UniProtKB/Swiss-Prot annotation:
Activity toward p-nitrophenyl acetate inhibited by N-ethylmaleimide, 10-(fluoroethoxyphosphinyl)-N-(biotinamidopentyl)decanamide (FP-biotin), iodoacetamide, CuCl(2) and ZnSO(4), but not by phenylmethylsulfonyl fluoride, EDTA, Mg(2+), Mn(2+), Ca(2+) or paraoxon, an organo-phosphate inhibitor of serine hydrolases. It comes from Arabidopsis thaliana. Gene3D superfamilies: alpha/beta hydrolase (3.40.50.1820). Homodimer. The modification N-acetylalanine is found at A2. The lineage of its organism: Eukaryota, Viridiplantae, Streptophyta, Embryophyta, Tracheophyta. PANTHER family: S-FORMYLGLUTATHIONE HYDROLASE (PTHR10061:SF0). Optimum pH is 7.6-8 for carboxyesterase activity. One of its GO terms (biological process) is formaldehyde catabolic process. It comes from the Eukaryota. This is S-formylglutathione hydrolase.
């Protein structure tokens, strides 16, 4: 393994293994952890495609692995699950831990342009550094066959990263994503601090803005949204994204679910549909 990449945890599940790793990120300038579920079929002679999962505010790389139950379907389909952390950690930037929705645990999957937050480059970490690290160190993974998914802030990350990198990912899905961050409080706070006042820069990290430019999609976008989600009306705004998709005939399946909230109970209920969605796009 590359210098500085070390395994820090391993548990068997559905005949595969959850493994956790630590490494020093050149992109972020700090030590980072990430988790991988290796399905039982994964080997150097039978490489597994990769589904990246981007988590939401306050989360680490462990939330999805521990709570979602995605390993059952991933084991069946032969998909590796890769879950990075949600921000740099341990940099001790003044104010980084003052609120749950900004700084530590709230990287918003962008490349910050403001000097104070210059290490917050989760976009480059997810799109460039992490795939390279995986391809160099895990012969049982096929990083050229990849899809991406996420929840809330991570759903925002999955949608924007997918739309800006249609050559790198076969499909995208999201649970309760922040689809129009330039028009919600979470997004406005994060973008103002990370990106400054340049609204054109904001739009590069807004799925509702991006779909008008990047819509030559080979796979339907799948979004699940709980109707009892406390953040649904004011922060997530999926109807705005739906309108933007309709304008350019972008294929979107937006499913609204009565009674479900913003939690991992909701994710666990429908995660199998998402794994199947990606398995189809990855031709498994």
């Amino acid at each position: 393994m590359a210098s500085g990449l070390s395994e820090i945890g391993s548990t068997k599940m559905f005949d595969g293994y959850n493994k956790r790793y630590k490494h020093f990120s050149e992109t972020l300038g700090c030590s980072m952890t990430f988790s991988i579920y290796f399905p039982p079929s994964a080997s150097s002679s039978h490489k597994s495609p990769v589904l990246y999962w981007l988590s939401g505010l306050t989360c680490t790389d462990e939330n999805f692995i521990i709570k979602s139950g995605a390993q059952r379907a991933a084991s069946t389909h032969g998909i590796a699950l890769v879950a990075p952390d949600t921000s740099p950690r341990g940099l001790n930037v003044e104010g980084e831990a003052d609120s749950y929705d900004f700084g530590v645990g709230a990287g918003f999957y962008l490349n910050a342009t403001q000097e104070k937050w210059k290490n917050w480059r989760m976009y480059d970490y997810v799109v460039k550094e992490l795939p390279k690290l995986l391809s160099e160190n895990f012969s049982q993974l096929d990083t050229t066959k990849a899809s991406i998914s996420g929840h809330s802030m991570g759903g925002h990350g999955a949608l924007t990263i997918y739309l800006r990198n249609l050559d790198k990912y076969k499909s995208v899905s999201a649970f309760a994503p922040i689809t129009n961050p330039i028009n919600c409080a979470w997004g406005q706070k994060a973008f103002t601090n990370y990106l400054g006042d340049n609204k054109a820069a904001w739009e590069e990290y807004d799925a509702t803005c991006l779909i008008s430019k990047y819509n030559n999609l080979s796979a339907t976008i799948l979004i699940d949204q709980g109707e009892n989600d406390q953040f649904y009306p004011d922060q997530l705004l999926p109807s705005k994204f739906e309108e933007a998709c309709k304008k350019v005939n972008a294929p979107l399946l937006l499913r609204l679910h009565p009674g479900y909230d913003h939690s991992y109970y909701f994710i666990a209920t429908f995660i199998e549909d998402h794994i199947s969605h990606h398995a189809q796009a990855l031709e498994l």
